[in-house]
């Protein structure tokens, strides 16, 4: 019966929120047909309102259908009209379903036109479906009297709150907190301070203190309680104070203090840390001393077959050792291979080698091809430029037998010679008749 009542109270609370009308902070306006202004609620604001009223897990959406009504292309630009049907369902099974429409005009890219049209249609259908639940989700925007009065309500835009931003540091802090909680559960109950009574302070330990062990990350540390010095003779004032104790002093008030580590724990932790630091410092000192004395680990070159035996620290046969300075006697070594230096002409003369390389270069064509034996060394061969068959046909005409016989002297033509300045005279030819 209590669950039913709580569920009923939850529904009444949701219904009360849905009956309220929207404030001016949630209402936006745009220019409609002509000079009129249309009031509407943006999609992201409608989603935030639904999360506040129903809860982030109290409602869901479902796209039932998406239809392309038209697609026009003119001069490389696209215009699309799209229809979408969306259903909004609540956790108890209640749902609202409505239709939305989206259009895009004169879009250059086809894919972008489809994307904008479909998103606009789905968002419109979502807002119209949420409107069916009540005034708080946009149904009040269809009341003209309400719109006429809401314009007179003044409001201050919300200030930007930098502390309300979701930052990566917040996520890291949450992860660290969860890790700390997990470590606390694995370690067991934490040590807490408690006030010691006078009897505890003056009590003489009858047995040696027992060693307690505490595991943290698979490491065991020994903790010994602090020894308390007790005087042999107690003053009468202390005895009377022990007899006159307040009952509140006997109460264990360990829950009223923080979970800080006790002083003896801090001493033990510092001792362990100092031991580790001393060990690390000794290792570092040994390494530095070896480097200072010049001790270098031996380096050995071996063959591939002897590498496995070297890894297993087995004895290596003498034949498997690799000598990087070995020089074969069958090869004539004229240049020191261990040094990268240019070869001088004096060294070639000492070795009896010819330093002139022009005779060597003349034996090869420009592209590195060796020339035939008919060419001499003094006259290097120069390859003539090659022409294709089509170029030869265009540039070189065919010759007759008379032309191939040999060159013939050109006939000498006697023409008029100019001896005076001015216009040359026309000579009368014998074959031409004078026509009167």
Curated annotation (Swiss-Prot):
Subcellular location: Nucleus
Principal location class: nucleus
DNA-binding region extent: 127-131
Gene Ontology CC terms, in alphabetical order: nucleus
Coiled-coil intervals, chain numbering: none
Superkingdom assignment: Eukaryota
GO molecular function per UniProt: DNA binding
Region described as Disordered: 180-252, 367-436
InterPro entries linked to this entry: DNA_recomb/repair_Rad52 (IPR004585), Rad52_fam (IPR041247), Rad52_Rad59_Rad22 (IPR007232), Rad52_Rad59_Rad22_sf (IPR042525)
Pfam families for the chain: Rad52_Rad22
Amino acid composition bias (Low complexity), ranges on this chain: 402-417
Keywords: DNA damage, DNA recombination, DNA repair, DNA-binding, Nucleus
Compositionally biased intervals (Polar residues): 208-219, 230-242, 372-401
Family: Belongs to the RAD52 family.
Oligomeric and partner information: Part of a complex that includes RAD51, RAD52 and RAD59.
Function field: Involved in DNA double-strand break (DSB) repair and recombination. Promotes the annealing of complementary single-stranded DNA and by stimulation of the RAD51 recombinase.
Protein name: DNA repair and recombination protein RAD52
Species of the source: Kluyveromyces lactis (strain ATCC 8585 / CBS 2359 / DSM 70799 / NBRC 1267 / NRRL Y-1140 / WM37)
Phylogenetic classification of the source organism: Eukaryota, Fungi, Dikarya, Ascomycota, Saccharomycotina
């Amino acid at each position: 019966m209590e669950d039913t009542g709580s569920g009923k109270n939850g529904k009444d609370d949701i219904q009360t929120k849905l009956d309220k009308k929207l404030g001016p902070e949630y209402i936006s306006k745009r220019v409609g047909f002509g000079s009129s202004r249309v009031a509407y609620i943006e999609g992201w604001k409608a989603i935030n309102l639904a999360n506040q009223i129903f809860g982030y897990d109290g409602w869901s959406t479902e796209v039932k259908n998406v239809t392309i009504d038209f697609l026009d292309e003119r001069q490389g630009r696209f215009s699309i009209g799209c229809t979408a049907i969306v259903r909004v369902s609540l956790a108890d099974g209640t749902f609202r379903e409505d239709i939305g429409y989206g259009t895009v005009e004169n879009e250059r890219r086809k894919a972008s036109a489809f994307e904008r049209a479909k998103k606009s249609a789905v968002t419109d259908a979502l807002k119209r479906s949420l409107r069916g639940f009540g005034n708080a989700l946009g149904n009040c925007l269809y009341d003209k009297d309400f719109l006429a009065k809401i314009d007179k309500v003044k409001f201050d835009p919300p200030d930007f709150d930098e502390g309300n931003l979701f930052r990566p540091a917040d996520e890291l802090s949450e992860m660290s907190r969860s890790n700390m909680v997990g470590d606390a559960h694995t370690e067991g109950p934490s040590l807490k301070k408690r006030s010691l009574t006078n009897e505890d302070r003056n009590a003489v330990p009858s047995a040696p203190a027992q060693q307690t062990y505490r595991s943290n990350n698979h490491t065991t540390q020994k903790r010994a309680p602090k020894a308390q010095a007790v005087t042999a003779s107690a003053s009468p004032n202390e005895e009377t104070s022990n007899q006159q104790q307040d009952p509140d002093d006997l109460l264990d008030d360990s829950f009223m203090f923080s979970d800080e580590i006790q002083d003896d724990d801090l001493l033990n932790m510092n001792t362990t840390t100092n031991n580790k630091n001393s060990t690390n410092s000794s290792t570092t000192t040994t390494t530095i001393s070896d480097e200072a004395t010049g001790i270098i680990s031996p380096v050995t070159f071996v063959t591939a077959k002897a590498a496995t035996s070297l890894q297993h620290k087995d004895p290596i046969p003498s034949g498997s050792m690799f000598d990087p300075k070995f020089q074969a006697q069958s090869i004539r070594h004229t240049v020191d291979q261990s040094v990268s230096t240019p070869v001088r002409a004096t060294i070639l003369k000492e070795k009896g080698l010819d330093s002139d390389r022009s005779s060597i270069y003349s034996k090869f064509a420009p592209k590195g091809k060796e020339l035939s034996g008919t060419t001499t060394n003094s006259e290097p061969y120069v390859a003539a430029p090659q022409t294709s068959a089509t170029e030869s046909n265009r540039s070189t005409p065919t010759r007759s037998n008379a032309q191939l016989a040999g060159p013939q002297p050109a006939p000498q033509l006697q023409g008029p010679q100019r001896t005076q300045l001015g216009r040359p005279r026309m000579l009368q030819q014998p074959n031409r008749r004078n026509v009167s």
